[in-house]
Amino acid sequence: MYDKDSIYSERDLNYVPCDLCGSDTPEVLFEKNGFKYVKCRNCDLVYVNPRLKDPLGHQETFYNNLAASFGDLDKQAHHDYTGSRRKRLLKEAAMYLPFNLNGRILDIGCGFGGFLKGAAEQGWKHPEGIEIAPVAAEYTSKFFPVKMKPFEEIQYNDYSFDVIRLNNVIEHLPSPKSLMSSAYNNLRSGGLLVISTPNFASLSVTLCRQKWQYIGGDDHIYLFTPKTISQMLGANGFKVVNIRTKGIHITPKYHVKKPCSYLETLLNNEIEIIEKVLDFFVRRTLWGHRLKVWAKKG
């Protein structure tokens, strides 16, 4: 039912069935920022319903404004590919080395091209990107081939890519299932789809519920678990070969990113120590709040 306290009017919103199984039997879990998060009674997929009629247009505007706010784009791009970030991206790109380096690797939601730089540095000859935020897309296209439209609307040759990467993407999309179908059609046989997304079956969610930092109705409109993302990948012909999780934020409501007093600094330090201890545990389970999945095209 429409929430009269929402900042959006009813004409801005649209009711949708479950993107995984197609049923229309949602159970309301909680509300956040005027949006209802529901769980499908049939398959357990969690999603926002009703949601904005044009969620992708909303995302494009938001992330383009965010990119434009950075000002010096060269400086921002350097920040996105330096120090620990660079090491992490190089390590990730190296994981795909068993695939054909002379082939093609696609990063959907490539931003300022940090991962594309890592892939090129590891020897990939044809790193490519997709980015819907014009400011970021125009910047990265100076260095790599970048298309500025939704993946499903792009006409690639079938079986074009060896690896397709989706980092913090599918939770924003109107239909993650449609994107997975397009990814399957654009991967070579044995090609790899790599997805990173928030994990709704995490210890962070258990402790924080709707206060969890990744919940915000107009932005993250799908929330997956290891179970539901595996089901959706399987429904689109993929075989899941690995699932991992990491990370935890236990007190997002009170965590101060820029402390202004000794007490706040002390509180932050204690929180970070607790989170590091718990992260050691959740990395060995599937309870981390960051979910990463590797799936192969059969």
Protein language model regions, located:
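S-adenosyl-L-methionine-dependent methyltransferase catalytic module, highlighting the catalytic core
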Residues: 166, 174-182, 192-298
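Conserved N-terminal segment of class I S-adenosyl-L-methionine
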Residues: 1-167, 177-180, 245-246, 257-261, ...
